[in-house]
């Protein structure tokens, strides 16, 4: 592919549309190289957003968008909604829907369309009610009002989950198979074809937020990190997502590749048994004190991880760097605890 360096995307943040990020790279593309091939993990079995966690794939493919999205500090920022406010009763939220947005079929995004989409989600997904419960949703022009059964101070944030992506429900009523063909959304891409092994997308010419970077995107499912790395090296794909720490060094010093690193929201942790001798809390504490997390992060994970000190990662703005870690690496403490227990 001329004019485009190979790209390696390591990690993925919540709410990030992969294809939107890739599109920013397309400064020099032409009609002869307007197809992007992305090696990725198999995201979904179908494109039905309410099934399992498949809505994440729809958003990652650049097909669906939500009312809000998150910035680098995980704060809610406008997306399909331009603003929102909470009523004095603490139960009523009013969202102003972006007047410039169209669905990929050309239909205008209205508050009524958002209402219908959210109601469909709640009707088809039991998981939706684990976020919040509403008593009434009303629409008036571009104003959407949601009344909830109790106070949800962070309702806009909850609506940023991919489960609540907004789709044109009239397409389904007119015979579209959402699971196979994907929803009609507001994102920069539209599904051309989809199987568990491969997704093909085309540019949404009705996209409201600028022209998408590539006319077509092909996403073969390559679940093994090493195989994804090999596909990138061989030129079978132009970009690979979530390359493992073991393959990271292959590309690190190669000028033919561009590495995009993003702070993840995920933790890697080990569950400790509390049975048998490990019922003793001092023995468990000794094992924890003997765990050199800094060394694991540096040597096993090739500096692509940071040593954990809390369940929440430092990418979430909860004062991670100010935490006092009572379980930090301390060999002498481990020895003392073991000695105490004989």
Which positions does each model-derived feature cover?
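Short, low-complexity disordered leader/linker segments with a strong preference
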Residues: 1-36, 49, 75
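N-terminal lobe/hinge region of extracytoplasmic solute-binding protein
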Residues: 39-86, 119, 184
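Gly/Pro-rich hinge or "lid" segments in bacterial periplasmic/extracellular proteins
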Residues: 71, 75, 160-212, 216, ...
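Aromatic- and charge-enriched surface segment that lines or borders ligand/interaction sites
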Residues: 82-127, 145
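Surface-exposed binding/hinge segments that line
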Residues: 85, 89, 96, 129-171
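Alpha-helical secondary-structure segments
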Residues: 110-117, 142-145, 187-188, 214-216, ...
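Ligand-site clamp/hinge motif
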Residues: 205-250
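Structural transition elements
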Residues: 307-341
């Amino acid at each position: 592919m001329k004019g485009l360096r190979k790209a390696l995307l390591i990690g993925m943040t919540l709410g990030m549309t992969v294809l939107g990020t890739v599109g920013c790279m397309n400064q020099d593309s032409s009609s002869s190289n307007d197809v992007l091939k992305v090696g990725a993990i198999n995201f979904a079995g179908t494109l039905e957003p309410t099934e399992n966690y498949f809505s994440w794939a729809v958003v990652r493919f650049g097909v669906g968008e939500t009312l809000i999205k998150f910035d680098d500090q995980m704060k809610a920022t406008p997306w399909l909604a331009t603003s929102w406010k909470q009523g004095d009763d603490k139960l009523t939220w009013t969202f102003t829907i972006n007047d410039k947005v169209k669905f990929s079929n050309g239909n205008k995004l209205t508050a009524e369309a958002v209402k219908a989409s959210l109601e469909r989600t709640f009707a088809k997904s039991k998981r939706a009610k684990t976020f919040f419960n509403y008593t009434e949703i009303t629409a008036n022009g571009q104003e959407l009002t949601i009344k909830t059964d109790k106070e949800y101070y962070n309702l806009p944030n909850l609506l940023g989950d991919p489960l609540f992506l907004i789709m044109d429900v009239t397409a389904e009523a007119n015979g579209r198979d959402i699971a196979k063909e994907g929803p009609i959304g507001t994102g920069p891409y539209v599904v051309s074809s989809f199987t568990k092994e491969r997704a093909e997308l085309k540019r949404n010419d009705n996209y409201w937020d600028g022209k998408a970077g590539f006319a077509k995107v092909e996403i073969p499912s390559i679940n093994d990190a090493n195989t994804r790395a090999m596909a990138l090296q061989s030129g079978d794909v132009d970009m690979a997502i979530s390359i493992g720490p073991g393959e990271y060094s292959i590309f690190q010093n190669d000028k033919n590749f561009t590495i995009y690193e993003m702070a993840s929201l995920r933790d890697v942790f080990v569950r400790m048994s509390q049975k048998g001798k490990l019922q003793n809390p001092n023995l468990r504490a000794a094992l924890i004190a003997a765990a050199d997390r800094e060394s694991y992060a540096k040597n096993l994970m090739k500096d692509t991880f940071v040593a954990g000190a809390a369940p929440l990662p430092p990418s979430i703005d909860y004062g991670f760097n100010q935490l006092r870690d009572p379980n930090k690496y301390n060999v002498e403490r481990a020895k003392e605890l073991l000695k105490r227990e004989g």
